[in-house]
């Protein structure tokens, strides 16, 4: 709903005479205070900020001079006083407010520079419960909200990144309404995000997956040229979660990531993280959030080649994710193909030099792999609401696989089944994945019927075989995975026609017996996982 009027009755220009400074992040605060003092502004401060300013030789009053009350309870109570909040909330041209200020000796505060206890940082670092609670700021948010509400007369600054803009604004000693309003909006967003972090931390501490109120906060990391399509606006907000991935990775080279780049890179890195680097190098190639090819191999270079072989046509302009450090040999292979993004836990210096030959290629170092078993939440907006669920961190290695056919899978078939099911978990439903010897042979994604996904995957495999001069597609003797149950035997029969000899699926269809009978008729081994992996 649009706001009827975007302004309240207020003077456009307000002269800054008294400033209250209370910050945990002291970056730039001495320089700001010195500039304010140079303009004749009275400085008032609290605790550690007061000490820092006094140590810098600046004339600064302690907040107790405004309140007539000392800081008590280890600093828990120092600004929660009418002497402070009256100075922030008073309507300057209201006669009753002015009379109350005079009667109680309240000094008007024109500028508040405040940032908060580092709760988010302490939480991210895994602080214990008492330490984290102690870093919940009370007085800071109260002063910020009071100042922002009274932005008609008070300027609130909560971000050190805005100090230069503040100094530019007060070049003549005043701030204008538009600036105060902008800073007020930013201030309320800051306190909302802060409270969201606290609320979510308590929910985690109490193991409340779905609390009565769920607040999601984020900080704008970058404003994008456009969204999924050029006519859509977009921005990338980060939540502070320290899960290795596109939000925390370092961009070593290349252009700014687009909306689609970020979405696809996240999908690619989460997929490749299913494969533990200590077991084998792995590579996943993604296009439009679906894998084109996934493979493991004795070397990273070979894993890349095998992943590419699955569907080299679709891989053009794709995203490459690796589960180990990008080395020079693999980099030399990758630069042969147009690629949008590479993401890896780390990148060798030699590989960086090779990738630098493609200056537009975005290269990300994530600093590690996300733990596929770590719990967390995912969210999706719908009209009028927010769908929130726990992350799909079910792992096929943790499942008790049930052999439902007369023939049990061979050891190799079982390995291929598990590999295919891992990949199918990351393919848009309906998903069918053929795999053989640690390599995807064909991937069918996002079809409305499962049999069509099975057919498309087989067609992809045949095309790949022709492109690479193979006598037969890799689906011959492969295992096939379906991320949800096979509702009819037709999908299974399509996979058998493509050459699959083993099937892995959740099971649970009303026609399971029909599907099992078809598998037995063709001497195909089939196992049920009991776990579905829909992905939309």
UniProtKB/Swiss-Prot annotation:
Belongs to the PurH family. The IMP cyclohydrolase activity resides in the N-terminal region. CDD domains: IMPCH (cd01421). PANTHER family: BIFUNCTIONAL PURINE BIOSYNTHESIS PROTEIN ATIC (PTHR11692:SF0), BIFUNCTIONAL PURINE BIOSYNTHESIS PROTEIN PURH (PTHR11692). Coiled coil: none annotated. GO terms for biological process: 'de novo' IMP biosynthetic process. Pathway: Purine metabolism; IMP biosynthesis via de novo pathway; 5-formamido-1-(5-phospho-D-ribosyl)imidazole-4-carboxamide from 5-amino-1-(5-phospho-D-ribosyl)imidazole-4-carboxamide (10-formyl THF route): step 1/1; Purine metabolism; IMP biosynthesis via de novo pathway; IMP from 5-formamido-1-(5-phospho-D-ribosyl)imidazole-4-carboxamide: step 1/1. InterPro entries: AICAR_Tfase_dup_dom_sf (IPR024051), Cytidine_deaminase-like (IPR016193), MGS-like_dom (IPR011607), MGS-like_dom_sf (IPR036914), PurH-like (IPR002695). Its EC number is 2.1.2.3, 3.5.4.10. One of its GO terms (molecular function) is IMP cyclohydrolase activity. Keywords: Hydrolase, Multifunctional enzyme, Purine biosynthesis, Transferase. The keyword Iron does not apply. Residues 8-158 form the MGS-like domain. This is Bifunctional purine biosynthesis protein PurH. The gene is purH. One of its GO terms (cellular component) is cytosol. The keyword Nuclease does not apply. HAMAP family: PurH.
